A protein has these predicted regions:
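Transmembrane alpha-helices of multi-pass small-molecule transport proteins
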Residues: 9-57, 137-141, 161-177
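Membrane-interface helix caps and helix-loop-helix hairpins in membrane proteins
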Residues: 65-70, 117-126
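C-terminal transmembrane-helix exit sites in multi-pass transporters
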Residues: 82-104
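Structural motif at transmembrane-helix junctions in multi-pass transporters
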Residues: 8-14, 62-78, 153-155
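Loop-to-transmembrane-helix transition segments
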Residues: 38-62, 126-132, 182-208
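Transmembrane alpha-helical segments that form core, pore/gating elements
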Residues: 1-5, 12, 27, 123-188, ...
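Residue-level recognition of pore/gate-forming positions within transmembrane alpha-helices
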Residues: 20-24, 80-84, 106-109, 113, ...
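Hydrophobic transmembrane alpha-helices of multi-pass small-molecule transport proteins
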Residues: 101-118, 134
Length: 208
């Protein structure tokens, strides 16, 4: 709800960066000192951490873009396909076994998403695909977590996610933070390309 309220006046990378800075501050002050200090950054799975971070960035940003254009209920309903995708991806990437009843449940769930998105009808809008993309990124995050969860701590994985968010948001700010690509009537596109502005006092609480 907070993200949706901010999507009409602020840039996506600005909103995400502020959230990231708050989360990183929390981790560095309240979590890292009690979990070995900066030793938590040591890892043998750096590439996997980067991939996980990019999956989260992909998932969050596409979902936030969906919130700018769709009713909250519709965006959340489509995003709920993520558990189904996790199951499918676990078969493909982790060789998990899924029984026929679970496959039937997946088919019913995917049919429900098709009913909501309504492809091929006049009611269809491209923004309906954004939460589906977000769900895909979220599902891949969980697959990668399964792969490294046995050797990497939760705090290490959390920190690398925030670092990835920070890098991506800063790069977005450098390349389009001046609003050079803004001016679209599409709310999702405008949220993505809007210029960085200083938050209004009454919006600071929502950012935090």
């Amino acid at each position: 709800v907070g993200i949706k309220s901010l999507s009409g006046g602020y840039a996506l990378h600005q909103v995400v960066l502020v959230r990231t800075l708050i989360a990183t501050t929390f981790l560095l002050t309240l979590m890292v000192p009690f979990n070995g200090g900066l030793k938590v950054l040591r890892t043998k799975c750096l590439k996997m951490h980067i991939c996980r971070g990019l999956c989260v960035v992909f998932a969050n940003m596409f979902f936030f873009l969906a919130l700018a254009a769709l009713p909250l209920a519709d965006a959340v309903a489509v995003f709920f396909v993520s558990p189904l995708l996790i199951t499918v991806f676990s078969v493909v990437f982790l060789r998990d076994h899924v029984g026929p009843y679970r496959w039937a449940a997946i088919a019913v769930g995917l049919f429900g998403v098709i009913v909501i998105v309504r492809p091929g009808t006049s009611a269809f809008q491209l923004a309906s695909l954004l939460p589906l993309f977000a769900a895909t990124g979220y599902a891949m995050l969980h697959i990668l977590t399964r792969k490294i969860g046995g050797t990497e701590s939760a705090i290490t994985m959390a920190i690398y996610i925030q670092l990835t968010f920070m890098v991506v948001c800063i790069l977005m700010g450098l390349f389009m933070g001046d609003g050079r690509y803004s001016g679209s009537d599409d709310p999702s596109r405008e949220f993505l390309f809007r210029a960085w502005i200083w938050p209004k006092p009454d919006n600071l609480a929502v950012f935090i």
